[in-house]
Amino acid sequence: VRIEGPIGATERASAENIIPILEKAFGNPNVKGVVLHIDSPGGAPVEAERISTAITGLKAKHRKEVVAVINNLGASAAYMVALNADRIIAAKYSFVGSIGAIMAPWQLDKAIAKVDVAQRVYASGKLKAFLNPFTPVSPEVDRKAQQLVDQMGGFFLAEVKARRGQALKS
């Protein structure tokens, strides 16, 4: 099962594309184990979670070993998928891991102000439009964004420890 390129809802490596391939592989009585060929920088954590959930469920149902083979890159959400394998194999120079979360919105409010353009935003709450790149960022918005990133990164790290804890080096 090839998981190549960015993982995302509109990408080739989407849950919608990958899960049927997983189901076919696991459901084939001639297949003794499933190999995940991973070469991906990661991407959308929800898509990775959907793929991971499918792998976990299919492993339990069909009792087949899963091996993740990471070629050049198995980072972030791609590593999240690899965590569901019974074994992870990577080359000496494979880039593996990149555990955590990132949010990198643009801040364009000062740039558009220079050309005398402004966007009016009407939102039902103070933080409803906090990722809007055309509005100034307040310390409260910065704190909220960092809190969300820390929370997502914490979830990811806990999953790594739960699934790979014995294999991790100090």
Sequence positions of predicted segments:
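Short catalytic/ligand-gating loop segments at beta-alpha or beta-beta junctions
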Residues: 166-170
